[in-house]
Amino acid sequence: MINTTDYAFDVERYRDEADAISFAGNLGMDGFELLPCEGGRDDFFTERSVVGVHLRYFDSWLDFWNGKLEMLSKEYGSFEKVKEIFGGLDRSCILKRFREDLERARKLKARYVVFHVSDVSARELFTYQCRHTDEEVIDAAAELINLLLDGENYTFDFLMENLWWPGLTMTRPEMTKRLLSQVHYQKKGIMLDTGHLMHMNLELKTQDEAVDYILEKVAEHGNLASYIKGMHLNQSITGAYVKTLITKKDAMPSDYEACSKACYEHVFQIDQHLPFTTPKVQKLVETIKPKYLTHELMSYGRSEHEIKLVMQRAALKGKNV
């Protein structure tokens, strides 16, 4: 699959859905993993092209979930901004947002959906000093997921994605087990994001080292690795950038809008979503054997996206790129 949003920036790459389907098919792809956006073109992608749906997410949501609105007011600058971001001031607002996405996934006949299990504030992004633990995020995420899925007749796989912030990181098998054991939904699984896992090791210098590291962490999971049903395939070797970032703790803007912009820029400096170009990535995919493989790459246009997809596809065939 190819990752996409329904925002104009992505949709305008194609004349229409038929053109998007042709683009994917010519590259040997089965379709798209769609991330719906506020203000997106919700009429552009249909069940003809969508294989999976990536649920929308809140980077910093745990304090909101736990009713600690004062903390969020400090994070976002005002209660009005909190209300604007979450759609209100109580849990039902988060549940409403996710239920809308789940219903859309149902209508699109998506085979899987993706859910982030993570929490990070703007300050934590700059400092890498986090207030919440993996346990706290995982327990709250499991509670939220069960409220969303219990009693529903969804048919898709529900895949929980690792990130490099508190929550599911895929570096602590006991935490992966803690999450899976609490989620009731039978068709649950993991969406392994290779780039996100790479960010857990700031010492990685090459793609080959990264492949070895990912395989090592997967092996540590033993039988739990069978829950890895999906993979977001991409790479970013940005440990040096992060080491520099966390030494500049006073560089974070105090104004919310300026801070939000800076966070956005930093995240994409860290998580670059570049294609693998080492043939060793073939071993990674063949070892894990994901049911769903999404080439989750970042680009600024159709031609650039095609070039990057071709590069990663070639590496997967064992070619040096």
Positions of predicted regions on the chain:
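Histidine-acidic metal/acid-base catalytic patches
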Residues: 2, 94-95, 99-100, 106-111, ...
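Hydrophobic faces of well-ordered beta-strands that scaffold small-molecule active sites
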Residues: 1-9, 30-34, 49-55, 113-115, ...
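N-terminal pre-domain/capping segments
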Residues: 1-100, 319-321
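Generic structural signal for well-ordered alpha-helices
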Residues: 21, 40-45, 98-105, 142-149, ...
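Aromatic- and acidic-residue-enriched segments that line the glycan-binding/catalytic groove
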Residues: 62-73, 128-132, 246-252
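Short low-complexity, flexible loop/linker segments enriched in glycine and/or proline
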Residues: 48-49, 128-130, 309-310
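Active-site acidic/histidine proton-transfer and metal-coordination neighborhood
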Residues: 87-189
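Acidic-and-aromatic substrate-binding clefts and catalytic sites of carbohydrate-active enzymes
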Residues: 10-17, 28-44, 58-63, 92, ...
